[in-house]
Amino acid sequence: MDIEQARARFRSPDRADYPELQGYTRDEIYKDCFGGGALYLAARMVRTMRLKSGDVVLDLGCGKGETSIFLAHHLGVKVMAVDLWTSATYLNDKFAARGYRDQIVPLNLDITERLPFAAEYFDAIFCMNSFSFYGGNIEFLQHLLKHLKQGGQLCVGSEVLSDEFTPEQLQHPPHVYSFRLSPPNQDVDVFEGDFKKQHTPQWWKDLFAGCGLLQVIDCHELEDADVLYEDYVLYEHEHNIDPFDVEISLQQIEWGWHHKPRKSLFTITSCKR
């Protein structure tokens, strides 16, 4: 499938389903967001959370800070914006320029290491499109949840798979999920480092429920996940953001029409016991 065939077939999200994004331009929804869904996914996530103005929220893997601004703007919460790859200076300048310097604190650190937060400090933890890279085990959940208040919420929204890989696929991954990135990242094993870790919504629900620390409140696959992927691919192409990603995404979408697993999106919200 080429891009012109995609234009003819791909759909656009129904903006009426996302009142949280009323007034947002398409650029504001997608720009500087990492992973599938962008602020459409963030909007779905906050619907499942119980947050009030003044609550302290950890935005885990905040990327370039758009989700932190979204949380601060829509919910009036105080945000600790943490990312491994984005500098705190960049984030601070961005938050200040957008009018949120006193509401969002940026930090550059590795969330898998010892954390500089007090025990039970956060009212909620929010994580969009990064949790699968490091969070798919009980040990990490125990490490992270020390800093969440009892009764506080952990909300994760992420790229996910419709089905688990079969044993045969784990041995011989589908070509659309096993490829090399363009230089200088050509040595990255995308299957081992990303897709193999994504799993299904049920897998994540079982992990959260089985850790003994969380009660799962909501877990569901987005019914318009396919549409959100389609729209973002067209956005990337129109803005010449990442031609390689456009090409591989087109292949993944077309492959998913006829094979499993296909790419999807989900949210899971749980409460600390």
Can you name each region flagged by the protein language model?
Residues 1-49, 66, 155-186:
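Conserved class I S-adenosyl-L-methionine
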Residues 64-113:
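Class I SAM-dependent methyltransferase SAM/SAH-binding core
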Residues 115-125:
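A short acidic, Gly/Pro-enriched loop at the edge of an enzyme's catalytic core
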Residues 124-136:
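A short SAM/SAH-binding and catalytic strip from SAM-dependent methyltransferases
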Residues 138-153:
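A short glycine-rich, Lys/Arg-flanked "PGG" loop and its adjoining helix->strand segment in the class I
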Residues 195-212:
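Short alpha-helix
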Residues 218-273:
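Conserved Class I S-adenosyl-L-methionine
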